[in-house]
């Protein structure tokens, strides 16, 4: 089997059995990056010298019989809003074009502790605000399945590198669908974990109550393995869960779904859903039944209002979080300015892109005197209702089935001029973030034009094991 086609498990076994060297694997991926990167535009920063040095160190440990981590020698790509000590972290923004963090995010520390090898930082929508990776200040990433189309966003680079075989696994972040939608558009697997399961320390914040780091990979098992490494309580993140015991996500992953009860919300099968995606969902329902699951129509009425609540809450939190980028403490600074006020105004005007400015303005408006109660407070009440509605649903159902996106991967530039249409593409994903529950996106089928179609499986808080089991059962049927 070719190195680029191997799963994490296959790569690890080949390294430990000394059939392959980590250095050979890293070189194979960099060779493929050099072939495909000019067309795909997925990487912002490549770490070839660093990665080869780390790979040689892993090979030396194995040759000496030393103990190595569970991801020893495995290359991984990192979304460029996750801090990496000594490696540029830009958030795909002019504001942070030369920012080099002096520390590692907690997830990066955990990856390094397991001997994973960072091969580069990947493109994204600026400050994770977008659904197409067209909002990057540096480049537009293309979908490896059809280079005239977007890879999704905001973690478009994270999904594209896995789909293009330019990394076996990657990390993304998900605030309103930013792992799941790109995974669906690029035909890979991506998980948004339960809020608090993975530390956010070192993740440059967009909306702190919604952001969550998660894995993307070729297979369900790859994502389960990566989640096991990065999950767990962190004293540096006071929102990380202190109650949940660390789990073995691979244990029982092949046990099947016989006896599971899966809900299909009727609100998710509305007229705005592309007919080919609807057919994929219908076919999946029949497949789930044939595997022994019970699939029932259900209702989640409050979720129809989730999109408006999401954009108010996320924009309000972004307005607050991005206030720190002022040209004084760090970030872009113009050459000419008259005084401190001009410095702040010019820095933000020149360094933030249009979408970031749009959301800062929306968030500031929602938080302003006279509108706080009408917009922000009301959105928070709706968020609580959505969380409760999902909680009640999971008292009767093990999992919930859903589309990921109402549309197939769209053409580059098709929706850029119409922010509302872009926002509507998140209609099936944002409620999961508002509720704080986990959800996985996995490939379901392909359209008549050969475009990937993904589906979502939603679970209760800390229901990742159940999600992985069901996703794995469907994956084996493909």
UniProtKB/Swiss-Prot annotation:
Catalytic reaction(s) noted: L-glutamyl-tRNA(Gln) + L-glutamine + ATP + H2O = L-glutaminyl-tRNA(Gln) + L-glutamate + ADP + phosphate + H(+)
Top EC class, one word: ligase
Statement: the UniProt record of this protein carries the keyword Ligase: yes
Keywords (A to Z) from UniProt: ATP-binding, Ligase, Nucleotide-binding, Protein biosynthesis
GO annotations of cellular component type: glutamyl-tRNA(Gln) amidotransferase complex
Matches recorded under InterPro entries: Amidase, Amidase_CS, Amidase_dom, AS_sf, GatA
Pfam families in the record: Amidase
Enzyme Commission number(s): 6.3.5.7
One annotated GO molecular function: glutaminyl-tRNA synthase (glutamine-hydrolyzing) activity
GO terms classed as biological process: translation
Catalytic residues of the enzyme: 79 (charge relay system), 154 (charge relay system), 178 (acyl-ester intermediate)
Ligase recorded as keyword: yes
Function: Allows the formation of correctly charged Gln-tRNA(Gln) through the transamidation of misacylated Glu-tRNA(Gln) in organisms which lack glutaminyl-tRNA synthetase. The reaction takes place in the presence of glutamine and ATP through an activated gamma-phospho-Glu-tRNA(Gln).
NCBIfam families: gatA
Family: Belongs to the amidase family. GatA subfamily.
HAMAP family: GatA
Subunit relationships: Heterotrimer of A, B and C subunits.
Protein name stated in the entry: Glutamyl-tRNA(Gln) amidotransferase subunit A 2
Originating organism: Clostridium acetobutylicum (strain ATCC 824 / DSM 792 / JCM 1419 / IAM 19013 / LMG 5710 / NBRC 13948 / NRRL B-527 / VKM B-1787 / 2291 / W)
């Amino acid at each position: 089997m070719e190195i680029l086609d191997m799963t994490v498990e296959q790569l690890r076994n080949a390294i430990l059995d000394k059939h392959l060297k980590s250095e050979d694997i890293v070189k194979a991926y960099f060779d493929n990056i050099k072939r495909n990167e000019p067309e795909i535009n997925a990487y912002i920063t490549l770490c070839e010298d660093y990665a080869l040095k780390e790979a040689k160190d892993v090979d030396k440990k194995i040759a000496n019989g030393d103990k190595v981590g569970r991801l020893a020698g495995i290359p991984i790509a990192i979304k460029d809003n996750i801090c990496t000590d000594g490696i540029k972290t830009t958030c795909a923004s002019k504001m942070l074009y030369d920012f080099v963090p002096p520390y590692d995010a907690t997830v990066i520390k955990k990856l390094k502790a397991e001997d994973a090898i960072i091969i580069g930082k990947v493109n994204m929508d600026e400050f994770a605000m977008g659904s197409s990776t067209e909002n990057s200040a540096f480049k537009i990433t293309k979908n490896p399945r059809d280079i005239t189309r977007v890879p999704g966003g905001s973690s478009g680079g994270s999904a594209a590198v896995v789909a293009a075989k330019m990394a076996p696994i990657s990390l993304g972040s998900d605030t309103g669908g930013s792992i799941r939608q790109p995974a669906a558009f690029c035909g890979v697997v991506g998980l948004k974990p339960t809020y608090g399961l993975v530390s956010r320390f070192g993740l440059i914040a967009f909306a702190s109550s919604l952001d969550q780091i998660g894995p993307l990979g070729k297979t369900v098992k790859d994502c389960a393995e990566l989640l096991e490494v990065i999950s767990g309580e962190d004293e540096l993140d006071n929102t990380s869960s202190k109650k949940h015991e660390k789990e073995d996500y691979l244990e029982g992953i092949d046990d099947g779904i016989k006896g599971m009860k899966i809900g299909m919300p009727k609100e998710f099968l509305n007229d705005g859903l592309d007919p080919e995606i609807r057919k994929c969902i219908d076919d999946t329902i029949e497949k789930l039944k044939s595997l022994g699951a019970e699939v029932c129509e259900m209702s989640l009425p409050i979720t129809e209002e989730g999109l408006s609540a999401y954009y108010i809450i996320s924009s309000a939190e972004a307005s607050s979080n991005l206030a720190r980028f002022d040209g004084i403490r760090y970030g872009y600074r113009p050459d000419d300015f008259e005084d401190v006020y001009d410095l702040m105004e010019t820095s933000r005007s020149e360094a933030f892109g249009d979408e970031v400015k749009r959301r800062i303005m929306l968030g500031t408006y929602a938080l302003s005197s006279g509108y706080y109660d009408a917009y922000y407070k009301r959105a928070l009440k709706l968020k609580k209702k959505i969380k409760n509605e999902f909680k009640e649903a999971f008292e009767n159902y093990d999992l919930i089935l859903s589309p990921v996106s109402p549309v197939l991967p769209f053409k580059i530039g098709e929706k850029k001029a119409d922010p509302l249409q872009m926002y509507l593409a998140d209609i099936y994903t944002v409620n999961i973030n508002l509720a704080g529950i986990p959800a996985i996106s996995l490939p379901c089928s392909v359209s008549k034009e050969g475009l990937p179609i993904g589906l979502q499986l939603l679970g209760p808080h800390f229901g990742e094991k159940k999600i992985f089991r069901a996703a794995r059962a469907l994956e084996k049927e493909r």
